[in-house]
Amino acid sequence: MPDFKIVISDPQSVEPKRIKVKAKANDQIKSIAGEKEGKAVPQAKVNEKTKQLLNIDTLITLEITKQEGDKKVKVKSHFKVEVDNNVPDNEVWISKTMAEKFGAEDFEAIAYRTKTLQISIDQDKATNLVGLKIGDTFEANQLIGLPVKLKITGGSDNSGFPMRFDVTGAAKRKILLSGPPGFYPNEDGERRRKTIRGNTISQEIVQINTIIVR
């Protein structure tokens, strides 16, 4: 059975400021089970000045570009931020496990406020979301360890059929659509009959899209 995916977007992170930082593995930052595989949000520490400079609320992204053969590849990870004023300016402390993902324990990276991230959770944990509808909110702390409230904006089932906010229930239905989600017309006024899911999360839903609400 595939993992259940939660896509989280921060609507206040439109054009985040990007700065060059030094990222370091630090023994104070404990690894969290699943963080390297995207099943948990890893922790990072910055000082208050760096947090304010980047206008960070809860999440920070670190990004590097490295050479792999004849290609340049971007590597990035998202972290839950904790303030620690023992961390020098323009420096980010992370766990050794996450440093391995970047290929070094001490490296330069671009840091910015996270715009979007995806977390995978086991299907048994996802049962807590069954019955919720598009537009509903839930606390993410117990589910994925993030101290934020999330609002459901959409999702898709195990066949890739999207949820529709304007169709009540959880069943799969074939309806006439004039726009997204589920259909993107090539011409004005074009309509097409498409298969979609209703607005309610069921056992068949494998991904939901959410935004942070404050």
From Swiss-Prot:
UniProt-listed SMART domains: Ribosomal_S6e
A GO term for molecular function: structural constituent of ribosome
UniProt entry keywords in alphabetical sequence: Ribonucleoprotein, Ribosomal protein
PROSITE patterns in alphabetical order: RIBOSOMAL_S6E
Lineage: Archaea, Thermoproteota, Thermoprotei, Sulfolobales, Sulfolobaceae
Presence of keyword Ion transport: no
Family affiliation: Belongs to the eukaryotic ribosomal protein eS6 family.
Protein name stated in the entry: Small ribosomal subunit protein eS6
Pfam families, alphabetized: Ribosomal_S6e
GO biological process terms on file: translation
Name of encoding gene: rps6e
NCBIfam families: PRK04290.1-1
A Gene Ontology cellular-component term: ribosome
InterPro entries recorded: Ribosomal_eS6, Ribosomal_eS6_arc, Ribosomal_eS6_CS
Organism: Saccharolobus islandicus (strain M.14.25 / Kamchatka #1)
